[in-house]
């Protein structure tokens, strides 16, 4: 659904992104991780074309967005929804008006605008808070509104830039559950930028590690975990699984943390 090929972003002679290749299918959540300064924020701005790449291509549903002129690009960018770290809601607008804002800019008819806003607020569990202002909402509630706004133009790709940063564990879990549900229901490709490995373990299908502007390791999460003893594998599983021989040819796999999903143990033990 989104294909990034040889993406490079330079400021002067300094390459902040250097030959990024990334493909995310419809219905897939791809996590991008990396230390501060690795280029994650620049990659996010290039994906939604707030920054123009120096070289390389970004294709959404087969259309090369990097070749488009200004007017065509404005249209094509509707295919990419964005959820920001702190929701980015306008304080003087209600929850419903924040969600409706992109539709107003496009002069979407009132009836269709009301239908989309009502449907999305209901889907994210915030219909009963439609008339509330951001200051009246909790951090998790604001992020739910941000998710609804990111989806209101019915995008093919959702860019979620640190959507759980600063949220408590319970709220984080609820936002990730909602994100996964929306991914399944709407069949969108999700690019999830995060520094939290718990988030990757909980919801991502694939993961790519960015360092000094390059992807140094990537793959399906389960394969990365059971692959080589790499920094990314160790970060995803801080304490490696312990194995003890209990009988000839029979091995027992144990893991000493309670928060590891049962499906992970099954995948790692194959």
Task: Give residue spans per PLM region.
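ABC ATPase "signature
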Residues: 218-219, 227
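Conserved signature/switch motifs of ABC ATPase nucleotide-binding domains
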Residues: 132-135, 152-153
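Catalytic Walker B motif of ABC-type/P-loop ATPase nucleotide-binding domains
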Residues: 158-161
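ABC ATPase NBD coupling module
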Residues: 65-81, 105-110, 224-228
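The feature captures the beta-strand-to-loop junction immediately N-terminal to the Walker
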Residues: 33-35
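Helix-to-loop junction immediately C-terminal to a conserved catalytic motif
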Residues: 48
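Conserved ABC ATPase "signature" region
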Residues: 63-64, 100, 104, 111-128
């Amino acid at each position: 659904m989104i294909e990034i090929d040889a993406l490079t972003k330079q400021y002067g002679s300094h390459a902040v992104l250097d030959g990024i290749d990334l493909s995310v299918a419809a219905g897939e959540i791809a996590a991008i991780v990396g230390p501060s300064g690795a280029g994650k924020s620049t990659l996010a701005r290039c994906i939604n074309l707030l920054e123009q790449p120096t070289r390389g291509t970004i294709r959404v549903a087969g259309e090369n967005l990097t070749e488009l002129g200004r007017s065509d690009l404005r249209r094509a960018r509707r295919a990419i929804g964005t959820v920001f770290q702190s929701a980015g809601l306008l304080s003087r607008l209600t929850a419903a008006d924040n969600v409706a804002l992109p539709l107003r800019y496009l002069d979407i008819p009132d009836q269709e605008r009301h239908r989309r806003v009502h449907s999305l607020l209901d889907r994210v569990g915030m219909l009963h808070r439609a008339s509330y202002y951001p200051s009246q909402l909790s951090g998790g509630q604001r992020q739910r509104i941000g998710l609804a706004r990111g989806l209101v133009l019915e995008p093919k790709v959702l860019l979620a830039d640190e959507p759980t940063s600063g949220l408590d564990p319970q709220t984080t879990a609820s936002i990730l559950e909602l994100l996964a549900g929306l991914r399944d229901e709407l069949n969108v490709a999700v690019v999830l930028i995060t520094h939290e490995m718990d988030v990757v373990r909980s919801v991502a299908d694939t993961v790519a590690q960015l360092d000094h502007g390059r992807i140094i390791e990537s793959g399906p999460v389960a394969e990365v975990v059971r692959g080589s003893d790499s920094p990314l594998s160790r970060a995803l599983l801080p304490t490696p699984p312990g194995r003890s021989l209990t009988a000839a040819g029979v091995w027992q796999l144990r893991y000493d943390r309670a928060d590891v999903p049962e499906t992970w143990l099954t995948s790692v033990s194959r």
